[in-house]
Amino acid sequence: SLPSDPKIVSLYLTYLSSKDAKMSTLKRRLVSIGVIHKLKGHYLDTKHPSIIENIMGIKRRKGSIQLSKKPILINNLKELINAIDKQKKEEIKKFRDRSIILIGFSGGFRRNEIVSLDYEDLDFVTEGLKINLRRSKTDQFGEGFKKALPYFDNSQYFPVVSLKKWIEVSKITSGPVFRRFTKCSRLSNNRLTDQKVALLIKEYLKLAGIDSKNYSGHSLRSGFATSAAES
């Protein structure tokens, strides 16, 4: 029942911690609880000593102030694309992987947003590409939103050109844009998983001579944000 006693909220956070919830998850839950109280006309002191002291205690027990991974910046991006181009693998696979990385970076997409794209979500226009994201992590109401990718000068690192080539070579006309290959290197109808995207990024980082342990599948998105902030 509302309003909740800060001690009860603190106990709830302890319970989540016992289920191996990360510190970032605990903080998000606390913010959400505070927002719900506000919407219902109640006040919850999320800075109450019983809550803050418990959070600090959980952080000490876990011993994990989570280390953030490095963003993939423009220079890293070019090294990744060059590493893909040098691989002795089927050209069609190179087209797919190049498009995944370039689209992920230039659009600041999450991995799950990349793999959820369908052919029907793409609208190639004179200025570039409009992408309809039907659902996203930040889209609380499931209304969807659009992202636009403009044309750039250098075609080798140009996401729209790369994606167009992938669509042409793969002959995809409906359904998932990014798909798995079978063991015989045939393109299937099955959607690629976001875990596979993370593995691909790690693979090409290693091939580019970059220490992959400092990066994650989120590095494409964070690299986009960092590059945008620095530009």
Walk through the language-model features, giving the residues of each:
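Extended, non-catalytic subsegments within catalytic or DNA/protein-binding/adaptor domains
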Residues: 1-231
